[in-house]
Amino acid sequence: MNILVITKSAWDDRIASGNTLSNFFEGWNEVNFSCLYSRDAEPNNNICKEYYSISPISIFKHFFKPSKIGRRFIYDPQGSHSSDSEKEAKMINTAKRNKSIFEIIYHLAYATNFWKNESFKKFIADCNPDIVFCFGQSDPLTYRAVKYVKQNTTAKIISYYVDDLYRANASVFNIGQKLKNYYLKQIAQMSDLCYAICQRMCDEYKDLYGRPFRLLHKGCDISQPKTTVNSPIKFVYAGNLFYHRDMILGALAKAIDKVNNGDQKARLDIYSGTSVNDEVLSMLNIKGTSTLHEARPFEEIKQIMRESDIVLHVESFDKEQMKRVRLSFSTKITDCMQSGSMMMAIGPDAVASIDYASSIPGCIVVNNLDDLVNTIQGLMDCNTTIIENAVKTNKFAKENVELNQLRNRLKSEFKALL
């Protein structure tokens, strides 16, 4: 079976989307993977070797020589890296400050279709995909590449909707959002099988897109539950800092610092690849209490989470951010469940992931930031609660989200399409 993965970001285990792909597909024997993506950043995984990168930089750089657009390569961890990846990182940081303008430029780059050159067509032909797996996202390359494959091959299309990106009430003047809505709907319409990350999303998207959706979220390679508690107590968050999650972690760091009261009774370690400004850096780095670390390989993150006492999932209470993530089921929840540590979720229960966390035995859910100090103090005063809760969550994970069960189910459903 040949599977072509089409995605926006590089297949990198250190970021959420890449980690999800590896969680699904690692250990699939007799399957050939290839990946098409719209960034210059290098991949980082043990599954896929063959790649084709079509970044906006490449399109504009070779605007008058379209035959040079795109980069096909075999991934080699020790090999040379793209000279444009550093430029791209700087461009993305600039784009965040001028989002509207850069979104227009980004969409126009792929609208030219100059990237559909002979190199691209040969890559698709050589991949000879039986199945295309893509995220249900508003990325223009994803939509246009899926459409090309649908029209020019016999491959079955499988889409996976993770983030709630559709905006039903977009203004008639908001052309950018209207276009995103169109891409999202068209990807679903072109799909032979659609997945969504939470049941609430499955139900709503069935009505929205007129297609049935199946529930799918990451599986757990489950560790044994904790038997001892560290001193100081270790809180760990590993994930992106988008959607004001940085603000929630800042509030948590402040609460831990208040409970510590000059002694190091607990500490918070944050691991993220998200770029932050000096204000956020200062908020998340409190001497003796909290530290923001750079992203680490997922295998290292798993070990860090296993060695922690309390693993975290957080969402913002800001109304605009709640709208953005209301149907999202964070991949961090399964990462937390597999760690063997106690799980804590902070956020409003109107968000699907927090609502789900409330149903996990042993998971402490904080729905009001004013309760943080008392919650932390209670855990410090009774360490056995951490052990007891870790055991409860571990039992639930083994019964409901075991990794091999998930992979076997996925492989079976993929084969059933052929």
Task: Pin down the residues of each PLM region.
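Membrane-proximal helix-turn-helix segments that form the acceptor-binding/catalytic region
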Residues: K122, R144, Y148, N152, ...
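Nucleotide-sugar-dependent
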Residues: H244-M247, I301, V311-T334, M343-D355
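Acidic anion/phosphate-binding donor-loop and adjacent secondary structure
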Residues: R167, V172, D207, R214-I233
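Nucleotide-activated donor-binding/catalytic signature segment of Leloir-type glycosyltransferases, i.e.
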Residues: S272, D278-E307
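Conserved donor-binding/catalytic core segment of Leloir-type glycosyltransferases
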Residues: T228-L249, A253
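Carbohydrate-associated surface elements
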Residues: I197-R200, K218-G219
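A charged, aromatic-enriched C-terminal amphipathic alpha-helix characteristic of glycosyltransferases
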Residues: N367-N374, T384-K415
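N-terminal subdomain of nucleotide-sugar transferases
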Residues: M1-D76, F213, D221, D257-V259
